[in-house]
Amino acid sequence: EGELAVVIGRIGKDVPKARWREVVFGYTCANDVSARDLQRSDGQWTRAKGFDTFCPLGPWIETDFDPSNVDVTTRLDSLGGGDELKQNGSTSDMFFKAPEIIEYISSFMTLLPGDVILTGTPDGVGPMFPGDKVSVAVEGIGTLTNPVVSADDSE
């Protein structure tokens, strides 16, 4: 799941939408990996999204950036199927924009410097297999590319 990630730079509690930028340090690409089999069997997402190598971020943090209308794409370069565009969306189409997300989350938890908030993913998520490569691109930030490896090969 390719997503825009917001990196928090200042402590924030009950941050109103009008002041959301005051707590943001910058933005980066996120690959929100899920183990769908565990997600289905557990009935919730903590373990399915909590493995050590899940949710890579990068390639860097962009501090001078307007997240309101940028493209977010995810490509899967699979051993069996070649390079395929899996997700293509714009942040302008998100159900909840960064100001609303920050206002909501900070209403029940204090945001701390270094916290990362994922903003949601376009349609098109799908399975990945060992040997594949996943590339998440956010227009104006760059591209994050990660290999898919099995748990046995991840050390």
Locate each region found by the language model.
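N-terminal accessory regions of nucleic-acid-interacting proteins
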Residues: 13-27
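Short, basic and Ser/Thr-rich N-terminal targeting/leader segments
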Residues: 1-2, 23, 55, 68
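Catalytic-pocket segment enriched in acidic/His residues
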Residues: 36-155
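Short, structured patches in soluble enzyme cores that scaffold and shape functional sites
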Residues: 2-4, 8-10, 28-33, 61, ...
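Residues on a specific face of well-ordered alpha-helices
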Residues: 22, 28-31, 36, 55
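Short beta-strand segments in beta-sandwich/barrel cores
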Residues: 11-13, 142
